[in-house]
Swiss-Prot record:
Pfam families assigned to the protein according to its UniProt record, in alphabetical order: ATP-synt_C
One Gene Ontology term of the molecular function aspect: proton transmembrane transporter activity
Function comment: Mitochondrial membrane ATP synthase (F(1)F(0) ATP synthase or Complex V) produces ATP from ADP in the presence of a proton gradient across the membrane which is generated by electron transport complexes of the respiratory chain. F-type ATPases consist of two structural domains, F(1) - containing the extramembraneous catalytic core and F(0) - containing the membrane proton channel, linked together by a central stalk and a peripheral stalk. During catalysis, ATP synthesis in the catalytic domain of F(1) is coupled via a rotary mechanism of the central stalk subunits to proton translocation.
Name under which the protein is recorded: ATP synthase subunit 9, mitochondrial
Source taxonomy: Eukaryota, Fungi, Dikarya, Ascomycota, Saccharomycotina
Length: 76
């Protein structure tokens, strides 16, 4: 029984590594936004909605990893 519990904790910890990728993705999206707007301020209205879409897609992958982690801890 202890081995199954240890495997759940290890699996949940490993599945949260995907949150690191989501954080890096969000940082890249907003770094590109800041870089683009600083070079051409008039394009802000065009680029900002795309940056929010990129943020949402990056965050969705992180939330999927978090959901898998919670399922491993509490669901199975």
């Amino acid at each position: 029984m202890q081995l199954v519990l240890a495997a759940k904790y290890i699996g949940a910890g490993i599945s949260t590594i995907g949150l690191l990728g989501a954080g890096i993705g969000i940082a890249i999206v907003f770094a590109a936004l800041i870089n683009g707007v600083s070079r051409n301020p008039s394009i802000k209205d065009t680029v900002f909605p795309m940056a929010i879409l990129g943020f949402a897609l990056s965050e969705a992958t992180g939330l999927f990893c978090l959901m898998v982690s919670f399922l491993l801890l509490f669901g199975v």
